[in-house]
Amino acid sequence: MAKKSKIARNEQRKVIVERYAAKRLELKKTLVDPNATDEAREAARLGLQKLPRNASPIRLRNRDQIDGRPRGTLQKFGISRVRFRDMAHRGELPGITKSSW
């Protein structure tokens, strides 16, 4: 079980990323636009730098949805590998069977 403060911080980051996503995308488009002037690119770069640090989606952490474990998360299921194995053995995941060959 992860610390509740770490889970809460990550949830707050999700909100901030969502809030600034449109503005961030607009600034990024200006940066890579070949028709943009140098002044526009410079303004876009400064605008990106002025955004909050937590507005970047790279700062989000994929966590287990059940207990918040930060590592070994299976994206398809949203749970950690440990929890996945445990739930699969108990038959709580429909369609998942232990492989055998």
Swiss-Prot record:
* GO biological processes: translation
Q: Which InterPro entries match?
A: Ribosomal_uS14, Ribosomal_uS14_bac/plastid
**Cellular component, GO annotation:** small ribosomal subunit
* Alphabetized Gene3D superfamilies for the sequence: 1.10.287.1480
Transmembrane ranges, per UniProt, are none
For the keyword Magnesium, the answer is no
What are the alphabetically sorted keywords of the record?
Ribonucleoprotein, Ribosomal protein, RNA-binding, rRNA-binding
One Gene Ontology term of the molecular function aspect:
structural constituent of ribosome
Any idea what job this protein has? Binds 16S rRNA, required for the assembly of 30S particles and may also be responsible for determining the conformation of the 16S rRNA at the A site.
Q: Which family does it belong to?
A: Belongs to the universal ribosomal protein uS14 family.
Q: How does it assemble?
A: Part of the 30S ribosomal subunit. Contacts proteins S3 and S10.
What is the official name of this protein in its record?
Small ribosomal subunit protein uS14
- Organism ancestry: Bacteria, Bacillati, Actinomycetota, Actinomycetes, Micrococcales
